[in-house]
């Protein structure tokens, strides 16, 4: 089974399911067969794509799942990301209720700050976040993933909310403290996309002006 992967794709799909509205997804794809397949599949899901096409291979990956439902992902190729220099419809960002950034440069953060709610992941790169000098509404990452672990001393501006997830153990929200994960009595098939789905739900709630202190 082969589908578009990565945080951006999953967040866009989950938001599309939650809101029943058209979701705009700004991304970069390689000008190859994989890039073309990604574009067609995501478009058929009802997602509005704004693509910066690159003369490089589209990044690929495969996921291995163990008997406990835990997954390990192997990635092949360079990570492609849109930049502010790409001729995309950046002007529509100011009309958005909420934006989640998974890959970009610092200038895109500045343009996206016009949205009511702006969230991101540390995987974007702390230097990219700091160089934007933008105050984030939410910084969401896994406290179990070495690629997303960070300390507040590494941030030039402290986000309004920072959430570090820890899978079935719940996680930590700053300010607020530790929270527990909801117990799921269903059979666990796999954990692929759980963190990205969580991030999509969080953005949806914040953009809907739900009180985050109550729901955590």
Q: Which residues are covered by each model-predicted region?
A:
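Short catalytic helix/loop segments, enriched in acidic residues and glycine
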Residues: 1-8
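Conserved phosphate-binding/catalytic region of the ribokinase-like
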Residues: 152-216
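Conserved N-terminal subdomain of the carbohydrate kinase-like
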Residues: 2, 17-97
């Amino acid at each position: 089974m082969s589908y578009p992967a990565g945080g951006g794709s999953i967040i866009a799909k989950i938001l599309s399911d939650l809101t029943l509205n058209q979701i705009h997804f700004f991304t970069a794809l390689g000008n190859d067969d994989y890039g073309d397949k990604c574009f067609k599949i995501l478009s058929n899901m009802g997602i509005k794509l704004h693509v910066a096409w690159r003369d490089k291979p589209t990044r690929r990956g495969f996921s291995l799942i163990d008997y406990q439902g835990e997954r390990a992902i192997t990635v092949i190729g360079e990570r492609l990301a849109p930049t502010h220099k790409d001729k995309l419809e950046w002007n529509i960002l100011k009309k958005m209720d909420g934006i989640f950034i998974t890959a970009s440069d610092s200038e895109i953060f500045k343009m996206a700050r016009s949205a009511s709610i702006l969230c991101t992941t540390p995987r974007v790169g702390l230097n990219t976040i700091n160089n934007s000098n933008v105050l984030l509404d939410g910084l969401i990452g896994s406290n179990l993933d070495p690629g997303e672990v960070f300390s507040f001393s590494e941030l030039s501006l402290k986000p309004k909310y920072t959430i570090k997830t820890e899978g079935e153990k719940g996680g930590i929200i700053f300010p607020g403290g530790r929270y527990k994960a909801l117990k799921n009595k269903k059979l666990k098939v796999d954990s692929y996309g759980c963190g990205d789905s969580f991030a999509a739900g969080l953005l949806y709630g914040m953009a809907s002006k739900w009180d985050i202190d109550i729901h955590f």
